[in-house]
Amino acid sequence: VMKQAGYVTGSVGKWHLGLGDGAVDWNETVYPGAKEVGYDYSFIQAATNDRVPCIFIENGKGVGLEPNDPLYVSYKHNFPGEPTGKDNPELLRMHPSVGHAGSIVNGVPRIGFQKGGKAAQWKDEDMAELFLEKANKDKPFFLYYGLHQPHVPRVPNQKFVGKSGMGPRGDVILEADWCVTEFLKELDKLGLTENTLVILTSDNGPVLDDGYQDQAVEMVGNHKMAGPHRGGKTSLYDGGTCIPFLLRWPAVVKPGVSDALVC
């Protein structure tokens, strides 16, 4: 729709909308992908932070993959000799609470199993700055920026470690806030602020324990993550389905607050 209206389009960050058609060979061009749904440029995760393969996909190609170390992925079984969160807890810097007992990447156990592609594996702490760099690269008029924070595993950049006083979850929320601020600064620098519509929203309600032992439950205190609502992520209650929807368009939208239901 955006391309038909003449927009240059880009997608950067967390994807989780599916790539490929059935069995995917990650060492070749992954098709279909972001391009096939209308994006001129994409630099995305193959899935989410906590799922294999833990590599970036740029315009359908795995970033940094080397022919002599091909990447193999399975969601059914591990590859012989590859360490996992279940069998090798001594290798972990973050331990799972449920569901994340597969391949270990960057000291964090993931969902699923992967082998090879070592040079292409991401470093969780560096994602925010890398995504911002890619988001600003071509300055697309329509940009979908899927924030990877505060999705699990909650591994903050070193500059945010311990800064919130609320553990890793609080730290990555600070990092997400920084990411949004830096993006808005870029619009200011380009002189695009007044006539650019910025929408900040989410795909689900909040969550504390989302599969890793990161002190989120212990350190939340009296804070009500979903405000007055019951439930959270994965729940059918309002806490799971009511999400923030923030707009900024200085030339058109006047500041204000609305409780209207948007579907």
What are the roles of these predicted feature ranges?
Residues V1-C263:
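Formylglycine-dependent sulfatase
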